[in-house]
Amino acid sequence: MIKTRIEEVQLQFLTGNTELTHLKVSNDQLIVTTQRTIYRINLQDPAIVNHFDCPLSKELETIMNVHVSPMGSVILIRTNFGRYMLLKDGEFTQLNKIKNLDLSSLHWINETTFLMGIKKTPKLYRVELTGKDITTKLWYENKKLSGGIDGIAYWEGSLLLTIKDNILYWRDVTNMKFPLVLPDESEQFERLKHHAIKKFDSYNGLFAWVTSNGIVFGDLKEKQMEKDPASNNFGKFLSSSKVLLNFELPDYQNDKDHLIKDIVLTAFHILLLRKNTVTMVSQLNNDVVFHETIPRHQLTGSNTDSNEKFLGLVRDSVKETFWCFSNINVFEIIIENEPNSVWNLLVRDNKFDKALSLKGLTVREIESVKLSKAMYLFHTAKDFHSAAQTLGSMKDLSHFGEIALNFLQIKDYNDLNVILIKQLDNVPWKSTQVVLSSWIIWNFMKQLNDIELKINTTKPASTDEDNLLNWNLNLKEKSNELTKFLESHLEKLDNETVYQIMSKQNRQNELLIFASLINDMKFLLSFWIDQGNWYESLKILLTINNHDLVYKYSLILLLNSPEATVSTWMKIKDLDPNKLIPTILKFFTNWQNNSKLITNISEYPENYSLTYLKWCVREVPKMCNPIVYNSILYMMITDPRNDMILENDIIKFMKSNENKYDLNFQLRLSLKFKKTKTSIFLLTRLNLFEDAIDLALKNNLIDDCKVIVNDEILIEDYKLRKRLWLKIAKHLLLSMKDIDIKQLIRTILNDSNEILTIKDLLPFFNEYTTIANLKEELIKFLENHNMKMNEISEDIINSKNLKVEINTEISKFNEIYRILEPGKSCDECGKFLQIKKFIVFPCGHCFHWNCIIRVILNSNDYNLRQKTENFLKAKSKHNLNDLENIIVEKCGLCSDININKIDQPISIDETELAKWNE
């Protein structure tokens, strides 16, 4: 319920018997005036009071009227001498251009523009403040009416004026020519017989006008309710205005103590001041919601019962606060919970949007307003789309089933979707989101199917072309609408449910759209493969780079689009070719079967599986297991084309990929499919040289035989090479006819590199071979044999001489030896000889290795010393034999290396000498 109370405001700056003349409040700026002074208080900081002494010319000149702009930055002052002044930024400015205009009413349009009504003459001016200057424009003048303009209301182009007992209304003056002439509407009421301080007020498009019989009030914002000139309601704005009759007011008596002194509008109520009583009446039902009398106060030092006179009511249109003031006091009228008290009345009057715009409503109240609005739009206004928009914004789902049923009964799936989508955006529960989203998808499918049915049943006649075009446009729009919904609500959808709904409705395009949006590449891939669209399938494979899917669909793609499939495989990183071998072999079998039908070898199709595996071997050899190499060779060997180029390619591949394939398996294949040269190559790799020679000879491949016997492996195996050459020679000599036998023999002997001789060939000559054919080779053989016998004889003689020399040396060495007695010491250091490595010279002197080296380094044999030093500096100690050869050249005692010690004195051991003297 609405709560209203009146609180007195303490104005500490007023002292003594100072009386107030005017009160204005704008944007929390409270303006109080006395007869000559203006006080300004910021209600946000009321302790600071700014006062301005009005520059009046004479003592009798006083402030007569005060008008404050909506934001409180401009104060317009009129004195009793007819002068106008502007107070802005603390400075007063004279407005001489309007000094001759007798102001009766004023309405601010904005902070610098206002409409000004003239007293006695019905004229309306538009005044614009430009700095310290003003510009005026005559908006209205009526020479037929008498009296001035009492009230002005203006809202977004709508204008309302009151002139004595007349009220004039213009629906929109924005594009009209000024000054205005005839109004769109006008009414005449009984003139107010008594004088009121203010008998008209306007606020945010609302207006209220005090007449003799009561208060006429309305709302300029309702001007757009009826725009059709042909309608019966067009031009009935004034007649639809409401009236609050005087007798509806409490304590009404037609005397001066109960007459209306001032009127102020709130958003939904009318505040009235009658003497010292404030009454508040609802604009919606004319009910009195507040009625209170303010106690009067006495002036200081006055002997009368009361000197307080209530002057008027004031509204702060920006902050929506309300005030009442007398000549000595200011009161604030505090209104609380105004929206909560009127929302149900607005709903009763079908003013739902206005009710929803109220501040402070509870969630339950808002939901109730929305439901009432939706039911009115659905059942009364038949505006199903607007009803759906309203219902969709509701959070209360208790009536949802009934609402949905209403739309289903009229088969309005489009507006039902509006509700469902809005509800989907609001509900936080996942389960509810799944239900709503699935329902929405089903509705979309139903709509799309219905549109397609109409398209299919519309005859393609010229008369139906427009309808057909419209249905196609509707189909496209609905499809776009579905796509937008899916894009914006993906996280609220259950993918499997959506798939099921679309699949059962056979909506393939929508399935593709949805799968693309959720990036379900598996579904898209499966779909395109089912449709046989290999291009799209491969494009998806390349995009997702999923190896498992590549392996899964490899066979069907390779069989139907081999070139593109292989190209795609090559682009996919880290693809394992070993896992594709089963697919490749199946493709190769199919390729073989197709190739059998082709008679012209040049028309053979390309084996793309072989192309791919060769690419793998070349580009990613580390990923290729032996099965890859075996598969390549298998396809090459079993190729129905049997030409030398193919065999050369096989052998070339084998040579470049040694030890990476199964030799035995490939040999069996080669023999089975009669790839002779390949078989020969494999036999040699298996060291089956005799079998290789036999196979080559069987096929009369003499050059291949020669290559075999010259293999590097056979270089050390003379006997095997000879056996192989004997096979070749036998074949040549026994099988060749009508040839030059003499030349053949020479060729065999030369090619064998003297492995064979004419003697080896003799068993292979037939009985018809003449000696003339053998003469030259026999002579050469005998000459060579004679030379070899001579060489052998010389070798025997040399061997005998060598034996004699060896025996002589052995005898000499048997005489050269020395016997060392136990305890033998080094001739240099005197220590036991056996504790270190030592050398014994033929002269019998013995030295440790290190001792003899020291002797050499201290000797005067510069040649020997230099050799020793160079060896030690070079640190070539790994070859101690070289050092030994150096140090054993001369004895350290009895050779010339010790000659530099001749001049040195002999050292005598005194202890030893004493022993000899005993």
Curated annotation (Swiss-Prot):
This protein's UniProt keywords: Membrane, Metal-binding, Phosphoprotein, Protein transport, Transport, Vacuole, Zinc, Zinc-finger
Modified-residue entries (Phosphoserine), positions: 907
CDD domains: RING-H2_Pep3p-like
CHCR repeats: 585-741
Zinc finger intervals, RING-type: 826-851
GO BP, sorted A to Z: endosome organization; Golgi to endosome transport; intracellular protein transport; late endosome to vacuole transport; organelle fusion; regulation of SNARE complex assembly; regulation of vacuole fusion, non-autophagic; vacuole fusion, non-autophagic
Misc remark: Present with 2020 molecules/cell in log phase SD medium.
Oligomeric form and interacting partners: Component of the HOPS complex which is composed of PEP5, VPS16, PEP3, VPS33, VPS39 and VPS41. HOPS associates with phosphoinositides and the PX domain of VAM7. Interacts with PEP5, PEP7 and VAM7.
Similarity section: Belongs to the VPS18 family.
Protein name: Vacuolar membrane protein PEP3
Organism: Saccharomyces cerevisiae (strain ATCC 204508 / S288c) (Baker's yeast)
Species lineage: Eukaryota, Fungi, Dikarya, Ascomycota, Saccharomycotina
